[in-house]
Amino acid sequence: MALWRGSAYAGFLALAVGCVFLLEPELPGSALRSLWSSLCLGPAPAPPGPVSPEGRLAAAWDALIVRPVRRWRRVAVGVNACVDVVLSGVKLLQALGLSPGNGKDHSILHSRNDLEEAFIHFMGKGAAAERFFSDKETFHDIAQVASEFPGAQHYVGGNAALIGQKFAANSDLKVLLCGPVGPKLHELLDDNVFVPPESLQEVDEFHLILEYQAGEEWGQLKAPHANRFIFSHDLSNGAMNMLEVFVSSLEEFQPDLVVLSGLHMMEGQSKELQRKRLLEVVTSISDIPTGIPVHLELASMTNRELMSSIVHQQVFPAVTSLGLNEQELLFLTQSASGPHSSLSSWNGVPDVGMVSDILFWILKEHGRSKSRASDLTRIHFHTLVYHILATVDGHWANQLAAVAAGARVAGTQACATETIDTSRVSLRAPQEFMTSHSEAGSRIVLNPNKPVVEWHREGISFHFTPVLVCKDPIRTVGLGDAISAEGLFYSEVHPHY
């Protein structure tokens, strides 16, 4: 009988605790566990949760990613837009009758042989690259083979159009896109993207995206990572023909954020035209009303003189924010003799401390300060396994959420999933790293439960987070644009800007 009473007593108390939980769901778990333990019922069962580092990191991101208080309402994006024809690089080279040879980089492609050598060069590194193809007829022939190839897919292309598409996925945002928009591209664009009539043209600009998977082979070559090689004969985007249309459209559209891209497309132009056009870019940006932040999205470049001009000819001081990857960051510091500029290429995963040093140098040398009339206060850096957001203190808010959101979308978009599928991604970021190599940096040990790491250096804040890398990416093109758009979407600029 006593045994029965004890069992019943325990049962009633367990039921009571359950009722408390149902009636007071907001009561902290620790309080409930203490209550359970005080009743001598043994340790409370641990709440279910993700066990893998990837699962814990994804759950931590979801808790951190919140919308900013002040949100963008109208975003204007320009000026490069095209149709991406996406297919297997190896299969296209085979269809063109090309055989595996030796890799060699070419800053401009003049022939099919140049294409094959450049593709092999970057496939061997697992690195993304973009090149201009100079011969119109040869490019047209290659583009026709690619476009009609079984399995070839047509997508919205061009940094501006891709960023516009990403923003347009948010129904509460109005998006203006200025760029060379032909019939196929117009058909592919989201209904929420408004294209001014002056941007419409009769013929599309095509870019060929040659993808390869991690471990894919071509002759003796084996790709270490999945990536893509992009090339085009794009004259409209190359001359940034839509720049003036873009700026003239802003007065009527009244955006509260402007995103500019396409400077890299000028590499196929003469030096004189590049110089002239850059000056016009600066003038156009200067015509954008004060108080509207301007984000510049960089892309793959090989012309050091053009990159140096972008840095020094008042383009950087005229923009508010930059988006770039590891190739562009290294090329930038090499072109402008910045930190670690003697490094010829990244050896595997870009060193966090080196990246941090270069970001610090850009903002210190070209960013806003008391002694410099520059608007540049933010850089969003992304590489395959981690991202860093660097900001000048006092100008931006919600950057912890912004960097996490950018990293999260890298995993979902590459895997073509709505949310992170932890079985299809892996955590490949360095488990520990130094925050600087040019000064006494801190040693950071990665914790998946606290995935965003923050550090500060002379009035500049850094937010670092790993990426959950998709093991079997469906599509790699446009990831950088999606990352930058998502980071901007969750960013908040202070009102005094």
Swiss-Prot record:
Q: Does the UniProt entry include the keyword Secreted?
A: yes
What's its top-level EC category? transferase
Q: Which Pfam families match?
A: ADP_PFK_GK
User: Any note on cofactor binding?
Assistant: Binds 1 Mg(2+) ion per subunit.
Q: Name one GO molecular function term.
A: metal ion binding
- Recorded source organism is Homo sapiens (Human)
Name any cofactors this protein relies on: Mg(2+)
Which protein is depicted? ADP-dependent glucokinase
Task: Indicate the residues that form the catalytic site.
Answer: D481 (proton acceptor)
Q: Which cysteines are joined by disulfide bonds?
A: none
The UniProt subunit note reads as follows: Monomer.
- According to its UniProt record, the EC number is 2.7.1.147
Write the signal peptide boundaries.
Answer: 1-22
Question: Subcellular localization, per the record?
Answer: Secreted
CDD domains, sorted:
ADPGK_ADPPFK
Q: Per UniProt, which keywords does this protein have?
A: Glycolysis, Kinase, Magnesium, Metal-binding, Secreted, Signal, Transferase
- Report domain ADPK positions: 52-497
Q: What is the lineage of its organism?
A: Eukaryota, Metazoa, Chordata, Craniata, Vertebrata
One biological-process term from Gene Ontology?
glycolytic process through glucose-6-phosphate
What family, per the record? Belongs to the ADP-dependent glucokinase family.
Primary localisation category:
secreted
Q: Which parts of the sequence bind Mg(2+)?
A: E297, E328, D481
Q: Which InterPro entries match?
A: ADP_PFK/GK (IPR007666), Ribokinase-like (IPR029056)
